[in-house]
Amino acid sequence: MTINPVSRKVAWLRVVTLAIAAFIFNTTEFVPVGLLSDIAESFHMQTAQVGIMLTIYAWVVAVMSLPFMLLTSQMERRKLLIYLFVLFIASHVLSFLAWNFTVLVISRIGIAFAHAIFWSITASLAIRLAPAGKRAQALSLIATGTALAMVLGLPIGRVVGQYFGWRTTFFAIGMGALITLLCLIKLLPKLPSEHSGSLKSLPLLFRRPALMSLYVLTVVVVTAHYTAYSYIEPFVQNVAGLSANFATVLLLILGGAGIIGSLVFGKLGNRHASSLVSIAIALLVVCLLLLLPAAESEAHLAILSIFWGIAIMVIGLGMQVKVLALAPDATDVAMALFSGIFNIGIGAGALVGNQVSLHWSMSAIGYIGAIPACAALVWAVLIFRKWPVTLEEQPH
């Protein structure tokens, strides 16, 4: 099914609007990382107890990505986007009104449902809406939207929360989503479902050892990162003894470094994806091991955050490129699985960080995170040696 030809300007506008949507969806997933202390204070809870919200959100996305993708596989994509945006916006209004922690968690589950569907269809939609011959750039734009959520979305969300209260942050995200929805309604044509894959494509994907090995690598390395990253805001304030303002600056540095990672990957990713991902995982190991020693100084923490931000962006982009290259015949199913597996890692990391903080010491989150990071490094070296060509991006 082809889309009626439109001017390149309109085609790019459609892709840019999708990238803005990607920015909003990722901002809301990560913004609680910068608001944990404030939310805990307003509900008279410990920060580590509130952190369980991150795990619940991530695991709902993980569990629901594939079922929702299959349930909606025959649904016209424009209508599906409108429905999931309405759910997303309504859930943010509930977050804003949340009168206790349980209601806040319920609102986050609603957002996670919308998130699960959005990420399983977005990559293939961007490819369909892109101007002729600009598929790679369209995907790169979506990845940029995702990256900017870490760079700008999370720190801005934290600043808004700091000065106007965490509820205002969620309300603002909901309003941003409403404006984006109105743009999508105006810009998008009808988009009949295509190339979405079905349950039939699952056994096919499971029989691809290179792809399955990548999924294992994804869950292990993401668990490592989020063990420490989920609690970086309370770590900076409670362990390092630094100010709330510096915690905001650090999140900004960490996110901003992601842009450098994105540029590095854009330049070298097509030819050297395997080497780049391996180097980035090694860099992540070093950053996690040095997190506590670096906590003695603002400058050391800032420098460490630059390398940490570069590493995690290269890892994320590298995985995405490889998954799409290994499953061109079932992009939606492969990306739904990837999104699910990525979120299993986020939830697992946040849970490990939560348990370490509650039952041991928050100061140990870097060391504990380094354990799965080391395992990921060994696994990456092994699988990239076994499938050196298969795992490079293939032209399709």
UniProtKB/Swiss-Prot annotation:
One GO CC term, this protein: plasma membrane
Segment forming the signal sequence: none
SUPFAM superfamilies, per the entry: MFS general substrate transporter (SSF103473)
Main subcellular location of this protein, as a coarse class: membrane
Topological region Periplasmic: 36-49, 102, 157-168, 230-245, 296-300, 354-363
Membrane topology, Cytoplasmic segments: 1-14, 71-80, 124-135, 190-208, 267-274, 322-332, 385-396
Keywords: Cell inner membrane, Cell membrane, Membrane, Sugar transport, Transmembrane, Transmembrane helix, Transport
Transmembrane recorded as keyword: yes
GO molecular function: carbohydrate transmembrane transporter activity; transmembrane transporter activity
Membrane association type: Multi-pass membrane protein
HAMAP family per UniProt: MFS_SotB (MF_00517)
PANTHER family: PURINE EFFLUX PUMP PBUE, SUGAR EFFLUX TRANSPORTER
Record protein name field: Probable sugar efflux transporter
Provenance organism: Salmonella typhimurium (strain LT2 / SGSC1412 / ATCC 700720)
